Amino acid sequence: MASKESKQMITGKSFEYSLLVQFEEKLKKQTNVQVIKNSSFQIAKECFESVSVLEQSEYSLSASFAVNFLMDIEPRLSNDIGKDDILQLEILSDDKGKKGDVRDVLAIRLLQKWEIGVSAKNNHHAVKHSRLSSSIDFGEKWFGIKVSKNYFDKV
């Protein structure tokens, strides 16, 4: 039997894969899409393929709703500025999260110098709790501006 941690990893990676697939399926009809098939992609795909068909369907449905919402509020996902404006989709490594970047799936338009990231949480306690900590300077990591000593003293 899989441990709780490994089951959470499998479900989390499965949902990340579902999000990326839904982005690709919905957006390839409207713009040029390129999926970055790195090691994180391969791991997520293997996790997705290891769960039941019912779980795959549930993840895909949830991901579909999320992607539809994001497409409604973020026009750059589906609107390119020409045939060379490729939307790259990537699953980030967990190492990024350890360094303060909590995004799991990234959509990038290099030509527009634009990106949007999604922190994929599926029935997970992290939805209720931020990933801020007393040791990671999220201001420096996210914005290039250090948080105050007062912040760290209070956290």
Regions picked out by a protein language model, each given a short descriptive name:
Residues 127-155:
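Acidic, metal/cofactor-coordinating or nucleic-acid-engaging core segments within structured domains
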Residues 96-101:
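A short catalytic or substrate-binding loop motif that flags glycine-/basic-rich loops and adjacent residues
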Residues 1-95:
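Acidic-basic catalytic patches of nuclease active cores, encompassing PD-(D/E)XK
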Residues 62, 113-115, 130-131, 151:
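Generic signature of intrinsically disordered, low-complexity, basic-rich segments
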Residues 106-117:
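Active-site beta-strand-loop-beta-strand hairpin of nuclease catalytic cores
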Residues 81, 124, 154:
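Enzymatic toxin/effector payload domains
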Residues 111, 122-127:
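Short loop/turn segments at secondary-structure transitions that flank enzyme active sites
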